């Protein structure tokens, strides 16, 4: 049995191509940012939860967003 898929002219051709090209770099930045966040969170955990920060969860989320942006910048520069 021979399976041949010719996707030319299909409306989702660009969507599938775009997802396969543009999703992996963001996923790499997300995963690398998570690793950076784990290290930074471990270093700053005592200060964040000591009461100096008004809302520790928002601080954690902000640090995570900064780490993902930093990881994306590192991946772009590399």
Swiss-Prot record:
InterPro entries reported for this sequence: DUF1656
Membrane topology according to the record: Multi-pass membrane protein
GO cellular component, one term: plasma membrane
Pfam families, A to Z: DUF1656
Highest taxon, organism lineage: Bacteria
Bilayer-spanning residue ranges: 20-40, 57-77
Keywords, sorted A to Z: Cell membrane, Membrane, Transmembrane, Transmembrane helix
Protein name: Uncharacterized protein YdhI
Organism of derivation: Escherichia coli (strain K12)
